[in-house]
Amino acid sequence: MTDTTSLAEKLTAHFKDTISGCETDRDQITLVVTPSHLLSTCEALRDEDDFSFSQLVDLCGVDYSTYGQVDWATEETTATGFSRGRETKTITIDTDQRFAVVYHLLSIKHNHRLRLRCYLPEENPTLASVTGVWSSANWYEREAYDMFGILFEGHPD
């Protein structure tokens, strides 16, 4: 059993009631957390000795409204390339999962990395601020608000 598999099993067992998924791809674990359980999950990931994710490496907002679209395909030269600015396309998306906030965590103690993903709806994308858990989230949350309109409740600014 690899360290990644072992960690994924521990995470799934410990957070079975507060997560909506745990995926492993390319030796990277992604824990999908529901918005209502984000803060308690982050505190446990930081404080519990089995995890000790003491460092938030990165936080970013994601807009999935055009995810998977190939507007910038450049496999061949054409006069119709780069159509994003010229054509209007109708895209069907799940409005309950239009946005996501993705957190990249590091456990220096265990030398583990973890990705948390929290999906947010198109209408009023709001999430608890994790600045009380990791102070480094401050500017990242500001940036996600500026770029995507994701509001972080309890943010110091």
Residue ranges and their predicted role:
Residues 1-157:
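Terminal low-complexity/charged segments
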